[in-house]
Structure formats: C-alpha cells, structure tokens
Amino acid sequence: AWLRDEGITPIAIEIPVFNYPLCDADPLGSDAKRLHQSIAYAGTVDGVGLDSKGNLVIWDWKTGGLYAEGRMQLAAYAGALHSLAQTQPDLFRAIADTAGVPRTGYLVQIPREYSEGMDPWKVETVEEWELDYLGGVFNSLLPVYQWQHEVREAEKAEKEKARSDG
C-alpha cells in the first residue's frame, strides 16, 4: 500500500549489493555476503523501484526504530547499486537503464504490532543530495572501520598465541 500511495513501481526486491570491484562473490548467488578480505561492505537492498517520474528510488523496511544510521545505510546501498549497474549492466538492466543512480531513498518503519487507528507505517525520505553526501561520509569511514577490524584481529591472534605458548 505504501508503494502505491507513493506512486512507486517496484522493479526488484532483496537485491544483494556489495562493493563489487573488491568482492569475491557471484552477484546473483546466495554467497553475496562472502567477502574478499579487503571488502568494505555488503548488504541487501529491500527494494528498488521507479517513482512516477521514472527516477530510480530505493527503500529499506525497518521493524525497529528509524535511526540516523539507516540514512547512511541507504547511501551505501545507493553507491553499491550504481557500481553494480556500471560493472554488470546485463544483470542489472532495469537499474542500468536509469544510470543506476537512486534519486531518493526511503526508510519505511513497519510496526511489529498493529492496532486500530495506528498509522500502518512511518516514512523518512532521504533526498538525492543527502544520499550523495552520506555516501561520501560512509566511504571516508570505511578505512577507519577496516583498520579497527585489523587491530582487533591482531590482538585476538596475540592473545591466542600467548595462551598456546603459556
């Protein structure tokens, strides 16, 4: 009902996305989250569609709360979709035909329990400029995240070695 009310025509649901050039996975396979050691991120876009003007839009269903991090998540998905549309146009034809650039993102909160008189959903709109901006922020934070991960793994390996030596 929300899609119809917004004038959105779905073209794909549950699309696995990833930073393709760094990922060791089959774009359509179930192992889309099996990552190369240097991969930055992977995830699943809940929905991709076209608005009434033919612009590409994406959305993410949320059964919990709507948080600021969800906006950055949509921006990461938007960047990954754009990359996939450029590198795999035959697999992502409907997306590639729109240049693979989402113009709008939606966080759609669906209540876990519904009662009479309650709004069936709450929606936060993420405009194109914010998707672009947050995509840049996300990409800037990836090296920090990767460094933290490497430090934790090295510390874990040191503790295991000390335990086995001790």
Describe the function of each predicted region.
Residues 22-23, 81-166:
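Metal-dependent nuclease catalytic regions and adjoining charged, substrate-binding loops involved
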Residues 46, 72-80:
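Short amphipathic alpha-helical face segments that pack within enzyme cores
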Residues 55-57, 73, 101-106:
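A short pocket-lining beta-strand/turn micro-motif at the edge of beta-sheets
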Residues 61-62:
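Activation of the activation-loop gatekeeper triad in protein kinase-fold domains
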